[in-house]
From Swiss-Prot:
Domain LCN-type CS-alpha/beta stretches: 1-64
Listed Pfam families: Toxin_3
Chaperone is among the record's keywords: no
GO annotation terms (biological process): defense response
Organism of provenance: Rhopalurus junceus
Lineage: Eukaryota, Metazoa, Ecdysozoa, Arthropoda, Chelicerata
CDD domains listed in its UniProt record: neurotoxins_LC_scorpion
GO cellular component: extracellular region
Free-text function comment from the UniProt entry: Beta toxins bind voltage-independently at site-4 of sodium channels (Nav) and shift the voltage of activation toward more negative potentials thereby affecting sodium channel activation and promoting spontaneous and repetitive firing.
Protein's name in the database: Putative beta-neurotoxin RjAa2
Amino acid sequence: KEGYPMGRDGCKISCVINNNFCKVECQAKWRQSDGYCYFWGLSCYCTNLPEDAQVWDSSTNKCGG
């Protein structure tokens, strides 16, 4: 599984071309994962996630609310 990790506010975690920052954010939540800064979305994106990992989803987005 893969997807955008969420901060405590339910929003995607922002980044500006900093893959190492995103890798640390992903691994803090899911130890075996990897991550990078998705350039077009300016958000961290995680890979190698467990199937039950909770990631940002546009249909259940609670960011800012």
